[in-house]
């Protein structure tokens, strides 16, 4: 059942995300055609401002979901209801905090923008973004019950359908009215509709959530708040690393640069969301496995899933380095391109982040938040300081470079240490050394494939979609050949190959 739910979670997420991805690129094409770069910059900037306000969440969601894995596995309805009551109470407090801080920031908005004079109704635009953040905390907490029961595909299916409708409506509004305010109103209300549907379904499917009104016992709350305390530092790091780039860029380079960068972020966001449905689909299953069977098989499962994540992120990182400018030129135009140096730095940061993902999934599923709490604080400080120093000389490349440097000095070595030392435990030093050897080889593989592919593509035309497909196929062949040569005989590759062949045979025979 664990494996089946993981696969359903993954398939539902992938199909919906593919449709959303196609529509989001279509919507962005319409956006840049009907509105200016400054509006695109505002869209990215305010998104990051609200991302910073999410610091008020303090990691409550992750801590609560981790606490639900065991009672869900044991079907302890009373304990689940108690945890959900606490979740609701905490998220109401968060919503009020976000609203208060968000309103207090309004007078300072003009100081964050350079070149935003041509954008009308800035305060109204900001209020719409703020309302979207506040309502998400008031309405979305019942999603957690599906995550605990490994049924996140139900929430994802609703979210993807409503998301597709939202994108279509936003495209229609831009084409017919060119009105950014109406565009944002749709962006505000459609997620509220998603939450309302999930809320109603959860009440029908889990009626015991209304039956019990009390909160968890004081000792249980203490354990949860301990995890929240650790996760708050992780949340701080995430906010500073992920939500300050556009703020610094806007202040030093202007909204137009933020607009250009937002197109690259759109591509990476869609790729990340796509891959997140694959890696994230296993989080609840890992937590469920740990709750029922302990950590005996955790390392073996980690090796396989971590290798699978490398194949996905490695393949896409190399492809993005060689082809992302070709794609952006075709979709948005020459004026929306960054130099190749900036592109390499952006994708290097994407690959570093990708190689961390499976380790983070295991950390979350195993509840190892406490052990690397100060790492998060160090990462945040280094990122902010280095980005502010480098942006003056190197611009966008300096901002992203700050993120890379902070990751290399903290996350890249300390996160696997925590996982092996406190999650795997047995013979952890040997396993940690093996992890770092694998990490270096993976970088060499992706860098080599990217360099060879880029050199070949410079000898080819970059004029139309057909050549884009041809170059994508050539890159795929090169990557596959190198992976087979380097990893073809490893246990992880053999396991994934055998599992894929077995699934295909079942499908061909009409099996499940």
Model region roles, listed by residue range:
Residues 29, 58-74, 147-148, 206-208, ...:
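Helix-loop junctions and terminal segments of transmembrane helices
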Residues 1-24, 78-85, 120-123, 150, ...:
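N-terminal membrane topogenesis motif
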Residues 88-114, 172-175, 299-354, 384-392, ...:
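Alpha-helical transmembrane segments of multi-pass membrane transport and lipid-handling proteins
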Residues 8-28, 40, 162, 186-198, ...:
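Transmembrane helical elements of multi-pass membrane transporters/channels
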Residues 32-39, 153, 164-196, 370, ...:
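Membrane-interface helix-loop junctions in multi-pass transport and translocation proteins
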């Amino acid at each position: 059942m664990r494996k089946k739910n993981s696969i359903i979670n993954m398939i539902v997420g992938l199909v919906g995300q593919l449709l959303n991805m196609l529509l989001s690129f279509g919507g962005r094409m319409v956006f840049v055609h009907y509105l200016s770069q400054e509006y695109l910059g505002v869209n990215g900037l305010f998104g990051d401002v609200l991302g910073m306000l999410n610091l008020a969440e303090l990691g409550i969601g992750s801590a609560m979901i981790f606490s639900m894995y065991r009672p869900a596995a044991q079907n302890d309805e009373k304990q689940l209801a108690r945890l959900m009551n606490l979740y609701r109470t905490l998220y109401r407090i968060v919503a009020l905090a976000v609203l208060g801080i968000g309103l207090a920031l309004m007078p300072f908005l003009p100081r964050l923008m350079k070149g935003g004079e041509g954008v009308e109704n800035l305060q109204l635009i900001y209020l719409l973004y703020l309302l979207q953040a506040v309502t998400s905390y008031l309405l979305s907490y019942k999603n957690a019950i599906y995550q605990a029961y490994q049924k996140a595909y139900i929430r994802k299916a609703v979210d993807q359908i409503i998301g597709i409708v939202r994108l279509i409506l936003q495209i229609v509004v831009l084409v017919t009215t060119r009105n950014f305010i109406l565009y944002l109103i749709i962006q505000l209300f459609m997620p509220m509709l998603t939450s309302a549907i999930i809320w109603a379904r959860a009440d029908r499917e889990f009626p015991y959530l209304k039956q019990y009104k009390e909160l968890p016992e004081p000792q249980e709350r203490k354990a949860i708040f301990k995890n929240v305390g650790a996760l708050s530092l992780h949340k701080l790091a995430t906010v500073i690393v992920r939500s300050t780039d556009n703020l610094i860029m806007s202040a030093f380079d202007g909204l137009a640069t933020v607009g250009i960068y937002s197109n690259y972020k759109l591509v990476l966001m869609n790729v990340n969301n796509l891959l997140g449905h694959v890696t994230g689909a296993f989080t609840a299953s890992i937590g469920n496995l740990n709750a029922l069977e302990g950590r005996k098989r955790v390392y073996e499962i980690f090796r396989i899933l971590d290798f699978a994540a490398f194949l996905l992120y490695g393949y896409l990182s190399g492809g993005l380095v060689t082809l992302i400018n070709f794609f952006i030129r075709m979709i948005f135009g020459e004026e929306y391109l960054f130099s190749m140096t900036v592109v390499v730095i952006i994708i290097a940061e994407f690959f570093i982040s990708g190689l961390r993902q499976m380790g983070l999934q295991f950390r979350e599923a195993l509840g190892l938040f406490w052990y690397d709490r100060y790492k998060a604080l160090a990462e945040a400080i280094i990122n902010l300081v280095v980005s502010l120093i480098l942006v003056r000389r190197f611009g966008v490349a300096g901002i992203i470079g700050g993120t890379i440097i902070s990751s290399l000095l903290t996350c890249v070595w300390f996160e696997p240490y925590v996982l092996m030392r406190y999650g795997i435990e047995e013979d952890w030093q040997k396993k940690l050394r093996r992890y770092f050897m694998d990490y270096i080889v993976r970088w060499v593989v992706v860098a080599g494939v990217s360099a060879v592919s880029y050199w070949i593509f410079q000898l080819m035309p970059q004029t139309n979609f057909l050549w884009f497909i041809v170059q994508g196929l050539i890159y795929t062949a090169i990557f596959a050949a190198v992976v087979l040569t380097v990893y073809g005989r490893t246990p992880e590759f053999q396991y994934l190959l055998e599992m894929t062949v077995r699934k295909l045979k079942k499908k061909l025979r009409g099996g499940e």
